[in-house]
Amino acid sequence: MAVATSAVVNGGYLIKPSLTKLGDDKRYENQIFSEETSEIMRYLLSQVVAKGTAKEAFNKDADKAYTEDGKFKYLVGGKTGTSHKIDKKSYTREKLTTFISVLPIHKPKYVVLISLDDPKGINREYGEPYNTWNWSDAGWNAARVSRQIIDRVSPILDIKARYIPNENMLINTSL
């Protein structure tokens, strides 16, 4: 999933996973779609965090997620996923929640994949904007865990997970 997401956001190139740093000539394999498609996908993934299913994790529970003038500061994109598990014959009541995040979304460098096996819901802790999956969907838990990890590793990795977008941003908001 991380390799596929990397291709979606890096200009369409499949990347060979490695635990050590490789030269660019050894990292990139095939280009499977265009830079333009990748830019559109980066914009869409940023909207999951800004306005979509991961919004609650990245703004309501975040320390200073907005600037004083109300502009969104997280430079993260991602995708939530919630599903019922399946046994031999049917779906069960147990769930699997996943959030894959990319940062910084304008020039992707890192992918964080969080997958939680049958998480417990956060019951009304954040008000009641919606009650999907009894407060145990990926936007309520896996995305929140991802945000907490991003908050902690961003200073260590010397990346700006939070910043104020400007006109020079690659993402075209007029789509």
Question: Language-model segments: what does each one mean?
Answer:
Residues 50:
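Betabetaalpha-Me/HNH-type nuclease active-site subdomain
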Residues 1-30, 36, 45, 53-158:
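Active-site beta-strand/loop architecture of penicillin-binding DD-peptidases
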